[in-house]
Regions:
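A domain-start/cap signature at the N-terminus of enzymes
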Residues: 56-111
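Serine-hydrolase catalytic machinery in alpha/beta-hydrolase-like enzymes
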Residues: 108-191, 195, 199
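Active-site nucleophile loop of the alpha/beta-hydrolase fold
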Residues: 146, 237-245, 274
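Alpha/beta-hydrolase fold nucleophile elbow
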Residues: 205-216
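Gly/Ala-rich beta-loop-alpha elbow adjacent to hydrolase catalytic centers
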Residues: 215-219, 223
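Conserved hydrolase catalytic core segment
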Residues: 225-234
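The feature captures the conserved acid-bearing segment of alpha/beta-hydrolase catalytic domains
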Residues: 244-314
Length: 325
């Protein structure tokens, strides 16, 4: 029996299933309750809802972005921006580093959240979210985007966020969008680990046991691929990962790769959609089999000793309720 709990939070619904209830989260250890519960509810929940209306479920609105919180300024976070250029692939990454202003008051190592699709993520980080984080053991924020004024660099993310062909191990045409390349996740991960992360750690001390990676859609594939890679990150948030992409290539990898049992690794799988006023799903491409795929992943991770949980997040017009399947 799967129990799904829907909790109303300003018309957003956060769901934990597979026997994990919201009350359980509220009673987790001090580490989870004070840091990652806040991150989940304030950033990951809102970005999942945002993501559900974007690239995987509906065509993203590719309009130039207004000034973000780093440009406007925040009372709670200081932001730095740095560009990283890869000459071999002619790409320039724009990375925003958000450091809580409490850093000036303490020498503690900080939890950190590395977010993909950084341009879009930064456009939806608001002062009220940063205030809430600041008041609850604020994490360092690292938004990894591209040199563009649009929310997404679709061709670049298609290459960077997806795993290589399982037979050749090389990039190839994206089977979903043949005009783009795919399969460059290993190279992109090296940029993060060898260039971006060291720059972050030169600016602020990070806690190695509290380094989170968040990605949506293709970014969710990158998160899962990074879990299989096993380096650097301790917490993995895969929001609406495109598990059906390329004949379920990521599912095939997960089924075959043997993970080393690491109790310090934690995985959250997240799915979501938006409902219209009439109660119908906004997404025309909603994967009805997505929950079953996530269940299979959870089962595999559980067998290999990786702590994993599943969240279902939906925006709708209804009262709090519990659904059982």
């Amino acid at each position: 029996m799967i129990k799904i709990h829907l909790i109303d939070n300003d018309n957003y619904y956060y769901v934990l299933s597979f026997g994990i209830s919201w009350l359980y989260i509220r009673k987790m250890t001090h580490l989870y309750r004070k840091i990652f519960t806040t991150v989940l509810s304030q950033i990951f929940g809102s970005l999942l809802i945002l993501g559900a209306s974007l690239s995987i479920y509906a065509k993203p609105e590719m309009k130039p972005l207004p000034a973000n919180i780093a440009e406007i300024g925040s009372a709670y976070y200081s932001f730095k921006v740095k560009k990283f250029t890869t000459t071999d692939q002619n790409k320039t990454y724009r990375v925003w580093l958000g450091i809580p202003k409490t850093v000036q008051k303490t020498q503690n190592a900080y939890a950190s959240v590395f977010m993909l699709d950084g341009n879009a993520a930064m456009s939806h980080l608001k002062e009220e979210i940063l205030k809430s984080l600041y008041e609850n053991d604020a994490p360092v924020l690292v938004a990894i985007g591209y040199k563009t004024n649009l929310p997404f660099a679709t061709a670049f993310r298609s290459l960077d966020y997806t795993p290589a062909d399982l037979l050749t191990g090389k990039p190839a045409q994206d089977p979903r969008n043949p005009e783009r390349m795919s399969g460059g996740s290993a190279d992109f991960r090296n940029v993060i680990l060898k260039d971006i992360a060291p720059w972050v750690e030169r600016n602020v001390k990070l806690d190695a046991q509290k380094r989170a990676l968040w990605g949506h859609s293709y970014g969710g594939l990158f998160v899962l691929d990074s879990l299989l890679d096993g380096r650097y990150f301790s917490h993995f948030f895969a929001a609406s990962p495109s598990l059906s992409w390329a004949d379920e290539r990521m599912m095939q990898k997960i089924r075959t790769v043997k993970l080393v049992k690491e109790p310090q690794k934690h995985v959250w799988l997240m799915e979501g959609d938006l409902l219209t006023h009439s109660g119908t799903q906004q997404s025309a491409n909603f994967d009805a089999n997505g929950i079953n795929k996530n269940r299979e992943i959870l089962s595999i991770f559980d067998q290999q000793g990786i702590e994993s949980k599943f969240w279902w997040c939906i925006k709708k017009y209804a009262k709090k309720k519990q659904v059982e399947f």
